């Protein structure tokens, strides 16, 4: 499933990033968002969501959130 279809406040594990743009993958990697890392959706809006990755919180748009594939921890 992708981040836009997760439960709020529940921790998931990143499976893969399905971004067509390698720069997006590099950007997410710089935030600590890569395969095997825990991620939690804190808040969701129509066009974006706020996620907790490691010690940071980030607001990402729905397109990017849809490219992040996760599984239950």
Predicted segments, located by residue:
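Absolute protein N-terminus
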Residues: 1-2
